[in-house]
Amino acid sequence: MEAEIWGRRIRAFRKLKGYTQEGFAKALGISVSILGEIERGNRLPSAAIIQDAADVLNISADELAPPEK
């Protein structure tokens, strides 16, 4: 469940900032297949990937994080 929430948020911010999966994966230094697994909720992103994604998207990791329930 948590992986799905992270995946949806990462995908939404990626699209909002105009990145393709290929371009975003390259900027993060990961494969497109790993990014796809994260965005589909099949893989929980590591803390390093979360921070790298926030940096590439020019947002804070807190903004990228799912809201507290």
From Swiss-Prot:
Gene3D superfamilies tied to this protein: lambda repressor-like DNA-binding domains
UniProt KW keywords: DNA-binding, Transcription, Transcription regulation
GO MF terms held by the record: DNA binding; DNA-binding transcription factor activity
Superkingdom of this protein's organism: Bacteria
InterPro entries recorded: Bact_TransReg_Diox (IPR050807), Cro/C1-type_HTH (IPR001387), Lambda_DNA-bd_dom_sf (IPR010982)
CDD domains registered for this protein in UniProt: HTH_XRE (cd00093)
Domain HTH cro/C1-type: 10-64
Biological process according to GO: regulation of DNA-templated transcription
DNA-binding region extent: 21-40
Pfam families for the chain: HTH_3
Full protein name: Uncharacterized HTH-type transcriptional regulator YazB
Source species of the chain: Bacillus subtilis (strain 168)
